[in-house]
Amino acid sequence: LWHLQPVVAQVQKTSTSAKQIKIGVSIWSSTDVLGSQSKKMLDAAGKALNVKLVYVDQGHESAAVTDSISTLAAAGCDGIIICNSADSEMTSAINTCNSAHIYLAQFYRTINKVASPQVYSLAKTAPYYIGAVHEDEVTNGYTLANMLIKKGDRHIDLEGWVAGDATFISRWQGYKKAVSEWNAAHASDKVIMSAPQYAGTTAEQGAAVANSFMNSDSKMDALIVAGGGGDPLVGSVGAIKSAGKTGKIHVVSTDFLPDLGKQLTTGGMTGESGGHYADPLYAFMMVYNAAKGNYKKPANGYDEIVNPYIYVSSTKDYDKYAKYFVSEFPYNDKELKAMANDTLPELKKQAAAISVKDVESRHSVK
């Protein structure tokens, strides 16, 4: 299984081998586009491995994020996976889990060691913080911004969700990198990108931000909706349609819409990154193995699993994605049970390989 028997397992409250394992999930929303996909994938894993899952929705509000860990600890969880907002929230989360002897892993997030050195140092030495599953967000941002630039868009407005969110900051770095590279090479054809306006995690706020940009920027020809779970994008796309500007304002985003195929056809969307809802599954597997006593935390460190994005910019792309990621899960019941016995290097390899082609090769009838 995962390495040798851990030292920290000796200080667990009770043995988990004879009872059902309980894993808590601290998530911004378990009902929006990305959150509901994440929950379905986790529920499938819980069912396959007889794990009880407890969800707390915290809306990416800092006080609610830290409170969610206390709530899940009080519920008797053996492990917790968390999609926090700011790195600073992880100090409280890590300390709570250490005190309660509960294993903790992040999903869709990792601690920025440059921006948050104290939190990073705490995470490395904390016996119950075991790691993070996340994406290469700078490359994600860079790829999406270049989709717009290559379409000829030069006045790009930026919609974030929460100021200071670690993932948004990384995506923003990527957007800025694409813009600065283009501008350095095209002095007479520069791209202007706005400062971000923040839409939280609701469709109403997404619509309000899009309307604000359309009213204040007469040259606006593109909108980046950085994320927020999918609902802000629904609102923004709806506002652009109501203004009669569908196809005139090009939109890219992260977190796939349920009707992405239609939006690509009508011009409501230009391109999107997503398909990464298996990310929390890998955090689940890390915590599950730790609770089973099959994990040893590295000395002065922790483990990270990097999950790639899938990029879609045509209906042909989306049709294949829909077949293998919407109509079914990227991992079936048999594969989920097998993953529970995989080593960490094996899980890292599986995560790095996930793509439409990967799922197609595993699930197509031979």
Regions found by a protein language model. Give the residues of each.
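Short, low-complexity disordered leader/linker segments with a strong preference
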Residues: L1-K22, N95-A100, V359-K366
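Hinge/cleft segment of the Venus flytrap/periplasmic-binding protein
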Residues: T14, K19, F284-K366
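Extracytoplasmic "Venus flytrap"
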Residues: S15-M41, A45-L49, V54-D67, A75, ...
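An alpha-beta-alpha
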Residues: I23, I27-S29, L42, I130-H186, ...
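Structural recognition of the beta-strand scaffold that forms the well-ordered cores
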Residues: I23-S26, G35, V54-V56, G79-C83, ...
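Short beta-strand elements in bilobed, periplasmic/extracellular small-molecule ligand-binding domains
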Residues: K47-Q58, D157, S180-A203
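Hydrophobic alpha-helical
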Residues: I80, S85-S99, Y175, Y198-K262, ...
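Flexible loop/hinge segments that line or gate small-molecule binding clefts
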Residues: N95-T139, L260-G261
